[in-house]
Amino acid sequence: MVDDELAELRRRRMEQMQRQAMDQQGMEEEAARQQQIDAQVRAALMEILEPEARERLNTIKLTRPEFAKAVEQQLVMLAQSGRVRQRITDEQLKALLAQLTPSKKEFRITRK
């Protein structure tokens, strides 16, 4: 009876260790896949953006990473669909950013 319990504990522990190993392997594969996607996005941006525009996008990425990610995705989609015929300049990127930036409500406080 003690041997059966010990064997059962060993079996459970072995299953747990196998699950952990598989989970870790899955996370490593996911991280590698994400790195590959990021590298492809960077390569695409290098091709479609002028250096000044790329610098502006990197500055935005430091302050608003989620917004920069959305802009990057938008630029890559435009390039993949063939709507970008030449490299995007800093001025064109500014115009795109102005379109994507949600308008802010302006509040005025008046005293009587």
Curated annotation (Swiss-Prot):
Q: Which GO terms describe its molecular function?
A: DNA binding
Show the disulfide pairing. none
Keyword check for DNA-binding, yes or no. yes
- Provide GO CC annotations from the record: cytosol
Q: What is the lineage of its organism?
A: Archaea, Methanobacteriati, Methanobacteriota, Stenosarchaea group, Methanomicrobia
Task: Specify the superkingdom.
Answer: Archaea
Q: Where is this region: Disordered?
A: 14-35
What's the source species for this entry? Methanoculleus marisnigri (strain ATCC 35101 / DSM 1498 / JR1)
Q: Which UniProt keywords apply?
A: DNA-binding
Q: Which Gene3D superfamilies match?
A: PDCD5-like (1.10.8.140)
Would you identify the family this protein belongs to, as annotated?
Belongs to the PDCD5 family.
Q: Report what the protein is called.
A: DNA-binding protein Memar_1972
User: What InterPro entries does the annotation carry?
Assistant: DNA_bind_arc, PDCD5-like, PDCD5-like_sf
